């Protein structure tokens, strides 16, 4: 396994996305912008969003969708909370009326699903913080639907399982990976998530699902990526440089066999390359 720093001095990085032109887009909460990094060493592009851009997703229309938290955490300024879109370098709003969007992903129903932390978390008294929300936003301009109203405090990353039957979310304060059975908004299954995994020594943040159905989860305080199989077992751990503070992860590369990690404390974007003989991955399928 080899880990390279592709770019640094990017601020508090989040939300990496592999683009069709083989560059990586990511957000910088502290710089109030998106950066687009060329792994081949080309110039870094900067797109100003204002506020605190958090998660990032690429739509089927080629548009970048930004979870704009409004600047509640570590941002250089404020902005209306909601979902922004980036088209040809221009930023506009796709949805507003949210609390503090954190991360987002496109679902099997073609809607954009968004975790909403709602407010800055009081770590000394987390019980005073509001429960997390999940929104589902149609792309046709219809109003977003609030699917989950009583989620975990500090709801964070999200992804759909490979069989599209469950929505996975990370509950950062409880170090848990939870699964909600996909159903209508009024279904009782949204009130009873299934505990998939409890993480050791680290707070789960963003994640990505590999083609084999494994969840690759960034653990901020632990400087590692844990790979969780569909049964809820940890099948591998990827140790990152000390002090990285990984916030999110995506799969990319020409053969979809590389991992890209936003390392917020070192203000950088990391690339992880694997080989078939990596001892740490013997029980897991590699990303590609």
List the predicted regions and their residue ranges:
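A short beta-strand motif characteristic of beta-propeller blades
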Residues: 2-7, 42-48, 90-96, 143-149, ...
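Flexible "stalk/tail and boundary" regions
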Residues: 20, 36-45, 60-61, 84-92, ...
């Amino acid at each position: 396994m080899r880990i390279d720093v592709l770019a640094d001095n990017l601020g508090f990085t989040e939300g990496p996305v592999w683009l069709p032109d083989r560059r990586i887009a990511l957000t910088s909460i502290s710089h109030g912008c998106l950066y687009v990094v060329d792994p081949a060493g080309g110039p870094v592009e900067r797109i100003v969003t204002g506020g605190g851009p958090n998660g990032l997703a690429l739509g089927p229309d080629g548009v970048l969708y930004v979870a704009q938290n409004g600047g509640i955490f570590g941002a250089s300024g404020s902005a209306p909370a909601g979902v922004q879109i980036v088209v040809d370098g221009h930023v506009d709003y796709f949805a507003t009326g949210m609390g503090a969007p954190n991360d987002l992903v496109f679902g099997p129903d073609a809607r954009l699903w968004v975790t909403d932390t709602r407010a800055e978390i009081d770590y000394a008294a987390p019980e005073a913080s509001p429960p997390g929300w999940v929104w589902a936003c149609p792309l046709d301009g219809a109003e977003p639907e609030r699917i989950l109203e009583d989620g975990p405090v500090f709801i964070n990353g999200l992804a759909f399982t490979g069989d599209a039957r469950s929505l996975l979310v990370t509950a950062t304060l409880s170090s848990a990976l939870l699964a909600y059975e996909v159903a209508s908004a009024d279904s009782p299954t949204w009130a009873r998530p299934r505990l998939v995994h409890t993480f050791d020594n680290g707070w789960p943040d963003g994640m990505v699902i590999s083609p084999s159905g494994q969840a690759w989860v960034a653990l901020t305080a632990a400087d590692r990526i844990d790979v969780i199989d569909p049964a809820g077992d940890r099948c591998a751990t990827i140790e990152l440089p000390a002090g990285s503070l990984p916030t999110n992860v995506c799969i990319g590369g020409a053969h979809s066999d590389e991992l890209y990690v936003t390392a917020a404390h070192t203000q950088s974007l990391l690339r992880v390359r694997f080989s078939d003989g990596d001892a740490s991955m013997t029980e897991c399928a590699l990303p590609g």
